C-alpha cells in the first residue's frame, strides 16, 4: 500500500510539473517523507523531478527564454558552492523555516499588488545566486526564480518553459552533490524505476491542462504553489 501511495504522489507531482514547469518537489517531498523518510523522499523527488523537467523541456523548448536562463544559471553556479559552505555554518532547519516565512510574506505582498521588476540580467543573476544558495542548503531552488519571473514580461508559456530549464538544471546539480555525499540510497531506486513511466503520464496530463488554462489561471496556480512551498518549509517533517 505504501508503494501504491508513493506512485500516486508521483503522478500528481508530475502533473503539477507538467502544467507549471516546476513544483515536483514541492508536492512530492512532504508527502513522500511521511511514507518513507526524508532522505528517501528527497532522493526520489530529485531523480524523478529531473525526468519530469526533461519531459516538460522536450515539449516546450521553443518557448524557453534563453537570455533569462543564462543570467539565472550563471548566478546559480555561484550560489551552489556558497550554499555548500553555508550549510556547515548554520542550522539548516532554522534557515529553511526563515526562508518559508519570507516566501509567504512575499507571496502575500504580491497578492496585495506589490510589483517586483526583474528584467535586468544583473537582477536575474542575483536571483540565481539566491536560488543556488538556498537549493544547496535547503533544497528550495524554486521560490526566488518563481518570484523573479513573475516580475518579467514573459508569457505563461515562456515562464513555464524557462522555469523547467533553470530549476531542472539546478536540481540536477543538487542531485549530483547529494549523490557524491552519500545521500542518494540504493533503496530509493526500485520506486524510481517503477515510477518512470508514470512521470511521463502525469507530465502529459499536466501539459494538457496547461493548454486549457488562461494566463491568469496559470499565474494563480503558480502563486498557490509558492504559498505551498512556504508552508512546507515551515511545517516540521
Regions found by a protein language model. Name each.
Residues 3-70, 128, 132, 140-203:
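Small-residue-rich hydrophobic segments that form or flank transmembrane alpha-helices
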Residues 30, 83-88, 147, 207-208:
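Small-residue-mediated transmembrane helix hinge/kink sites in multi-pass secondary transporters
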Residues 35, 63, 89-92, 153, ...:
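Helix-loop interface residues and adjacent transmembrane-helix termini in multi-pass membrane transporters
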Residues 39-112:
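Membrane helix-loop-helix hairpins that form the core translocation module of multi-pass transporters
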Residues 41, 83-88, 92-96, 135-140, ...:
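Hydrophobic alpha-helical transmembrane segments in multi-pass integral membrane proteins
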Residues 58-62, 89-90, 112-116, 137-138, ...:
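Helix-loop junctions at the membrane-solvent interface of multi-pass transporters
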Residues 65-76, 96-100, 119-130, 158-165, ...:
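Cytoplasmic-side transmembrane-helix entry/capping segments in multi-pass membrane proteins
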Residues 77-81, 92-112, 194-207, 215-237:
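Selective transmembrane alpha-helices of multi-pass membrane proteins
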